[in-house]
């Protein structure tokens, strides 16, 4: 269960490995000692001073990490951030099982008699929805899925393009977890770097990708693009024919040799119903991978599991991604499969219903507050299959200076959100959720999803997501009250 060579070579960790039968076999070491063990019994562990960290892995449950000694307390916040980004906390259901076993000082059992059936339902549904040509991979969360993708791509590049620099091309203002994790991976691994991909406001994704790929060609580097379509938070869709042309474009190095073709990794959490990989025309000549956060539409917010698929050209890449999903023990749990098997069959209908509600609400806001700038897909794009249920709202502002205008707008953002929550407490929530079964979700990206984004790239606008089940008349009534008092 411990892939020694990959963890050293791909992840860049430096360590010595020693197998011990009992704690007394652990010798003094001038460094950090990590004890890794597997157990079927959850119990209190008494650690020797020689052990700095104790990782106990419980099959099908997760793992428990004990930090030993005051001298190691300063690592805890960093460990928690890794758990938040590169992996995931033990699921609530598994935590309950672990606590029960701990209280009883006993072994535990996780019974999932229909797990194979649930796995088949989930995989078949994903293939039908995405039109993918590879077997879907299902992870414990969207971020753990992205981590497996990134580490799988790094592993592939190290094996096939030895010594060449690896470039992850990522929008600087995209969803906080995506952005933060990509930069953390680059900071931890030699020869890996993140390149900013401007996609919003006055920038065009296709043009930005073209410029960056031309620059990377000169360096003879390995390009991996991570992008969201539609973009987040401004919900913009690039010209897909132009994007196809840019991705397929033949480029030369300074020595006039062919460059390494890019891999296009698409986060399509906003529109998981759009079959990007099913199109013979769109990405047929490009290595394309798509992934989705399961905490949104796939499960309706009932679990965090995410999934990943690829087109025919990515079969070798998908093997690497699967390898790293297993190394990190980040596969979906049995309960997550059960939830996805129940919710995925209705996903496309829920997406359609949520889009209809969102379009209705956006049209209402446009009519009653025309001075507000709304970012949402056009009806033409919706007819092409882009039907998100999220929009961004740039409210009108006042003031004689730029600072006064910005401060007024930021206060207005909060005034609107707080009014919605106060007037419709059973439906309106102040959080970043999307694709939930019911309700509306309001946030300011700059102070939520973009927590680790550079200040200049943050978006101080209102982001709103609408669900398929919502009291739209009440939402319109409250918004009218807000707009009348601006």
Question: What annotation goes with each model-predicted range?
Answer:
Residues 132-136, 400-403:
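Short, surface-exposed acidic
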Residues 3, 7, 111, 117, ...:
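Active-site C-terminal subdomain of aminotransferase-like
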Residues 1-120, 124-133, 146, 156-168, ...:
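PLP-dependent enzyme catalytic core of the Aspartate aminotransferase-like
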């Amino acid at each position: 269960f411990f892939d020694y060579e990959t963890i050293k070579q791909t992840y860049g960790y430096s360590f010595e490995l020693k197998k011990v039968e009992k704690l007394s076999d652990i010798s003094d070491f001038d460094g950090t000692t990590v004890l890794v063990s597997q157990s079927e019994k959850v119990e209190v562990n008494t650690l020797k001073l020689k052990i700095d960290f104790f990782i106990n892995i419980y099959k099908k449950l997760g793992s428990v990490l004990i930090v030993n000694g005051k001298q190691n307390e300063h690592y805890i916040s960093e460990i928690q951030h890794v758990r938040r980004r590169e992996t995931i906390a033990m699921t609530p259901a598994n935590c309950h099982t672990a606590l029960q076993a701990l209280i009883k000082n006993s072994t535990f059992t996780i019974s999932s008699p229909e797990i194979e059936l649930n796995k088949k339902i989930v995989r078949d549904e994903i293939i039908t929805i995405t039109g993918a040509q590879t077997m879907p991979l299902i992870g414990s969360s969207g971020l753990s899925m992205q981590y497996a993708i990134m580490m799988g791509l790094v592993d592939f590049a190290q094996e096939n393009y030895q010594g060449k620099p690896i470039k992850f091309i990522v929008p600087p203002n995209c969803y906080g977890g995506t952005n933060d994790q990509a930069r953390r991976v680059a900071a931890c691994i030699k020869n890996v770097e993140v390149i900013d991909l401007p996609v919003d406001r006055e920038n065009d994704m296709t043009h930005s990708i073209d410029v960056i790929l031309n620059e990377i060609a000169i360096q003879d580097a390995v390009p991996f693009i991570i992008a969201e379509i539609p973009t987040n938070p401004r919900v913009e869709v690039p010209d897909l024919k132009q994007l196809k042309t840019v991705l397929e474009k033949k480029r030369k190095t300074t020595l006039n040799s062919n460059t390494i073709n890019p891999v296009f990794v698409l986060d399509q959490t906003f529109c998981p119903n759009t079959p990007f990989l099913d199109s013979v025309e769109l990405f047929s000549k490009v290595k394309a991978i798509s992934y989705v956060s399961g905490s949104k539409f796939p499960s309706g917010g009932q679990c965090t599991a995410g999934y990943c698929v690829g087109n025919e050209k990515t079969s070798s890449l998908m093997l690497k991604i699967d390898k790293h999903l297993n190394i990190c023990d980040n596969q979906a749990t049995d309960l997550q499969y059960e939830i996805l098997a129940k919710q995925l069959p209705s996903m496309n209908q829920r997406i359609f219903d949520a889009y209809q509600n969102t379009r209705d609400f956006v049209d209402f806001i446009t009519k009653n507050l025309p001075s507000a700038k709304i970012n949402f897909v056009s009806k033409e794009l919706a007819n092409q299959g882009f039907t998100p249920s999220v929009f961004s709202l740039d409210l009108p502002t006042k003031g004689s200076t730029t600072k006064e205008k910005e401060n007024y707008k930021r206060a207005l953002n909060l005034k609107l959100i707080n009014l919605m929550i106060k007037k419709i407490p059973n439906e309106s929530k102040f959080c970043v959720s999307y694709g939930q079964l019911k309700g509306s979700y309001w946030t300011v990206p700059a102070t939520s999803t973009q927590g680790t984004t550079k200040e200049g790239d943050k978006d101080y606008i209102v982001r709103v997501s609408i669900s398929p089940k919502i009291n739209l008349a009440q939402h319109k009534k409250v918004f009218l009250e807000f707009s009348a008092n601006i």
